[in-house]
Regions:
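Cytosolic beta-strand hydrophobic patch enriched in CBS
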Residues: 38, 110-113, 142-148, 182-184
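Conserved ATP-binding TGD loop and adjacent catalytic N/P-domain core of P-type ATPases
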Residues: 116, 154-222
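ATP-binding catalytic core of ATPases
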Residues: 59-110, 114, 129-130, 185, ...
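Hydrophobic alpha-helical transmembrane segments
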Residues: 1-40, 185, 209, 219-222
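Conserved cytosolic catalytic loops of P-type ATPases
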Residues: 26-69, 113
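Residue-level signature of catalytic and energy-coupling elements of molecular machines
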Residues: 12, 43, 116, 146, ...
Length: 222
């Protein structure tokens, strides 16, 4: 069994709250060889490092409804995009809804029921998995998709910017034989994306199943 370094995770949370991401880890890692360190959404991309790049709403769905539904599932899942969508909610004059039966999928997405509507929120791959038709010729690298009752309702294009501290800090952790564990909840933050887009050594990081990642990233966990 892996010996997860909760002390590292607590340090990471404090650092991320100040916008420093992984800045304090290399020194701490040196004294704990062979351990593991948990990396959450906000450790990689603190608030301000993910920006909204555009919104497109489809069919007869209103912007307020699509934004409200999407923001609700993002909030309820504890995803690192929560602040971004909360700010969007306010600017669009939308409100959070009451969602039931939230489910997190291994394929990169979420589902819940809102006022009798079956709502899906996730990546393009998740929409394909759930057989939601997507526009032909769609060319968006990172986005949040929303479908309502099996019909595509909205696309939120995102731009992720990696803080300067993250790459060298992860390199230091690996050099000190401290294995990063991706305890991410943002369904876009998968090893393939981190390696291809940001050249991070994601192949040397553990990426547990979705429910285990949720357990590890639970802020109430001791």
């Amino acid at each position: 069994a892996l010996a997860y370094g909760r002390s590292f995770h607590k340090v990471a949370r404090r650092v991320s709250q100040s916008g420093g991401a992984l800045a304090g880890w290399p020194g701490a890692a040196g004294s704990r060889r062979g351990n593991r360190v948990l990396i959450t959404d906000l450790d990689l991309f603190p608030p301000g490092f993910v920006e909204l790049n555009g919104i497109k709403v489809f069919g007869d769905f209103s912007v307020e409804r699509v934004v409200g539904y999407t923001a609700t599932l993002i909030r309820d899942s504890g995803c690192g995009l929560e602040k971004l969508f909360h700010d969007l909610l306010r600017t669009q004059g939308a409100i959070f809804r009451r969602a039931d039966s939230l489910c997190c999928y291994e394929g990169g997405g979420l589902s819940a029921n809102i006022r009798g509507d079956q709502v899906l929120v996730g990546s393009a791959a998740f929409m394909n998995l759930m057989e939601v038709p997507l526009p032909q010729g769609l060319n968006v690298k990172n986005a949040v998709f929303c479908a309502i009752d099996g019909e595509l309702a909205g696309i939120f294009a995102l731009n992720y910017t990696l803080p300067d501290t993250v790459f060298p800090s992860l390199t230091s952790l690996l050099r000190e034989r401290v294995g990063p564990v991706l305890a991410t909840r943002d369904f876009n933050l998968i090893p393939a994306m981190l390696q291809q887009r940001f050249k991070l050594a994601a192949d040397r990081m553990d990426f547990p199943p979705v429910e285990r990642r949720r357990e590890l990233s639970d802020p109430e966990q001791d």
